[in-house]
Amino acid sequence: MKIKINDYPTFNKEWDREKTEEKTDNMLKKIGKLQNKMFAQNKFSLLIILQGTDASGKDGVTKGLLKYCNPIGIKIYSFKKPTENEYAHDFLWRVHEVVPRKGDLQVFIRSHYEDILVPSVEKFIPAEIIDERFKLINDFEKLLENNDTKVLKFFMNVSKEAQKGRLMERIELKEKHWKHKDGDWDTREKFDEYLAVYEKIINTCNEIPWHIVPSDKNWQKLYFTAEIILKTLEEMDLKWPELISERFKSGK
């Protein structure tokens, strides 16, 4: 059954904010403990991919999710326009170079999906090359999972109205001026075109499923993503390493 992004809410009116935020904080504490165990075990890794339009809240949810995590085992990579050197390689070269090591929790703010998304809308790469990238990405993500890297993919589903409000804040609030880019407003004019490509990505690169996150409100977005990440970590075979010592015996 084809997934249609517009069938998914950007905001859930029935959620109680105070209760939701309390549940979220409890989940974040559990995520922190499990992430530390994963780092100590040094066997598995977790890759969290965050995609969404400009001002959908990818940076903010990253900050919230890692509140109680051990920073030593955390890596964050934000994908920008490819450099000249990156353009000289295949499109996955720059991605494979920064996937998580064993034990790490890695967050991709944007990802390899930008190499389908942007050229599809802006039309600077032939369609047949873009079509091939769908298969290559599916294969790449299977490779990661086959090597003990669990992959979670989130699409930050923000309404056009909420996006405009956040972009306006970057103009009006001094502490957010640094986030402003004129190009974000150019991209906004193609909001529906980008959404259509995202829909194709979600339906085609779906061997590892996508999670469509209601993102108009930061507290709802954080709850939704934390719940899935916690469930994933709980289902991984995470164990504290045994004591290695010739002098001491392991405690209970």
Language model region names:
Residues 1-26:
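Charged, amphipathic alpha-helical linker segments immediately N-terminal to NTP-binding catalytic cores
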Residues 14-22, 72-132:
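Conserved nucleotide-sensing/catalytic segment adjacent to the nucleotide-binding pocket
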Residues 30-40:
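Pre-Walker A adenine-sensing motif
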Residues 48-51, 149-162, 181-186, 205-224:
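Phosphate-binding beta-loop-alpha motif at adenosine-nucleotide cofactor sites
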Residues 50-66:
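Glycine-rich phosphate-binding P-loop
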Residues 58, 85-88, 114-120, 160-167, ...:
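Switch/connector loops and helix/strand junctions flanking conserved nucleotide-binding motifs
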Residues 120-136, 144-196, 243-248:
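A glycine- and Lys/Arg-enriched "phosphate-lid" helix/loop adjacent to the NTP-binding pocket
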Residues 194-252:
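NTP-dependent small-molecule kinase module
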